[in-house]
């Protein structure tokens, strides 16, 4: 999964929970007010696209690590963290998201998902399976449908 950064401890990304937070690289939207605009491009600036579902970026863009390193970080924090928050960019844009959620669940961690909800069919698929269903979703509604082109750079429905 293409992740641009990791926060090993957060008390603010999931209300009432202590988590690690990962930021997915890439977002199909281009919101004018995006606070993570460096994560919009699917290839980090000055770097190549991250093709492997096992490869992620570490603490800095382009600092490659494997997804198992994220899981090692979580395993080392059993009893300290309640879960993993997956943010972005846009997590629903990654085909590896279901596997990442399932891996965190298999280790006993809850999963929170920050998403714009841009891909409702992908979100429905996650919700239909216990192994990939996030325990919490922070849904960031960008704008009313008639304002999406000016706010998010996309038209309603795509």
Residue ranges and their predicted role:
Residues 39-66, 90-95, 129, 148-158:
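Conserved non-cysteine loop/helix-boundary elements of the Radical SAM core domain that shape
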Residues 31, 67-71:
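A general structural signal for well-ordered alpha-helical segments in protein cores
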Residues 71-83, 92-158:
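Conserved AdoMet/S-adenosylmethionine-binding subsite of the radical SAM
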Residues 27, 31-34, 104, 113:
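Hydrophobic packing within well-folded, soluble alpha/beta domains
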Residues 26, 38, 141-143:
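Short, small-residue-rich loop/turn micro-motifs
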Residues 5, 9-12, 62, 82, ...:
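A generic structural signal for ordered alpha-helices
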Residues 1-23, 32-59, 77-78:
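N-terminal [4Fe-4S]-dependent radical SAM core
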